[in-house]
Design a protein with these regions (language model features):
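Negatively charged
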Residues: 1-348
Length: 348
């Protein structure tokens, strides 16, 4: 029960290295700087929590954050940006005192905490969360992250959630309920150490944007997307950009009827040798810029239809091993070669 005489606030230690979250009546008695939990500051690039770093001025002095036992009685509805750009933050203690049962917005909560190695999320209640966008963006030092307790049944936005988590080698998302999610854009972007990713439990029936979803996942050797429902997806631009270790990719379940963006979709997939796109309907696609650029091991693209797209500069640039109806010609790399009669496609 929240006592109206109590106040949620954040206290900065005198040496500016410790942030402590309190919910009590003692704010006026504490030495040093304090901010109300809703206090913000405005800079050119946006509005930020008063105690955090900003895009223009990241915080490099805070080393630890602590949730005092008093904070357990507070019920925030947002934790967005609470630790944003605290670049030297190494530990968060007392997370068991943070009750997130009423929190709807966790966007950017740990964004830019590039020194955090672990975060204990076992007590996190995400049952009312709607937005987890950018939640762990640029947490570059995280080597493990247990989100198995997350209830994501009400979440609609998880774009860029793990973007830049370049030290994560594995991620168990088997408990994730994505049935309401509509935006998966950049979700695993820059997760360059991930070697496997099991998304078999993902329900993507409401997803409209999956662009850059696996961008830069350069250590992924396999990726099973057979369970993906792509019937509402409109943008898959850059979806597999830089997945340089993928040796195969089965997209036979992809429904592309609503898609209009495929720019850079496979750019830099330098280990792919064949792609079966015979099920692709690209009639609405208006951007195929650099779609297969740099796929220098790609020998065969199976597709029985002719694709037409005005914005297709360098679509096949660097596909030096590719051969369809005709062998690869470095002077012909746009969508005029996206056909099985006089181009680089092979009939299946």
């Amino acid at each position: 029960m929240q006592n109206t005489n109590q106040e949620a606030y954040v206290h900065l230690s005198a040496d500016e290295t410790i942030l402590t979250f309190y919910y009590d009546t003692l704010r006026a008695e504490r030495d040093g700087t304090t901010w109300g939990i809703d206090d913000t500051k405005i800079e050119d690039k946006g509005e930020f929590c008063a105690w955090t770093g900003t895009i223009e001025s990241p915080n490099t002095s805070v080393l630890s954050a602590v949730f005092d036992a008093s904070f357990r009685d507070f019920r925030p509805t947002t934790t967005a940006d609470w630790f944003l750009l605290l670049q030297s933050l190494k530990s968060i203690e007392g997370l068991e005192h943070l009750n997130t049962s009423q929190v709807k917005n966790m966007n950017n909560m740990f964004g830019g905490c590039s020194s955090l190695v672990t975060i204990n999320l076992e007590n996190f209640d995400t049952s009312n969360a709607r937005a987890l966008s950018h939640m762990f963006i640029d947490c570059k030092s995280l080597t493990s992250l247990d989100v198995s307790s997350f209830d994501t049944s009400k979440v609609w936005d998880i774009n860029f959630m793990f973007y830049g988590c370049e030290s994560l080698t594995s991620l168990d998302l088997s408990s994730f309920d994505t049935s309401k999610a509509c935006d998966l854009r950049g979700m695993f972007m820059g997760c360059s150490a991930l070697t496997t990713l099991d998304l078999s439990s993902f329900n993507t029936s409401e997803v409209t944007n999956a662009s850059c979803m696996f961008f830069g996942c350069s250590s992924l050797t396999t990726l099973d997307l057979s369970s993906f429902n792509t019937s509402k997806m409109m943008d898959v631009g850059g979806m597999f950009n830089g997945c340089s270790s993928l040796t195969s990719l089965d997209l036979s379940s992809f429904d592309t009827l609503m898609m209009y963006e495929m720019f850079e979709m496979f750019i830099g997939c330098s280990s792919l040798t064949t792609l079966d796109l015979s099920n692709f309907d690209t009639s609405l696609v208006d951007d195929m810029y650099q779609m297969f650029c740099g796929c220098n091991s790609l020998t065969t693209i199976y597709c029985n239809s002719t694709w037409n797209c005005e914005m297709s500069y360098s679509m096949f640039a660097g596909c030096t091993s590719l051969r369809g109806a005709v062998p690869y010609d470095e002077s012909k790399t746009d969508a005029s070669m996206a056909n099985p009669e006089t181009g680089y496609f092979s009939r299946k």
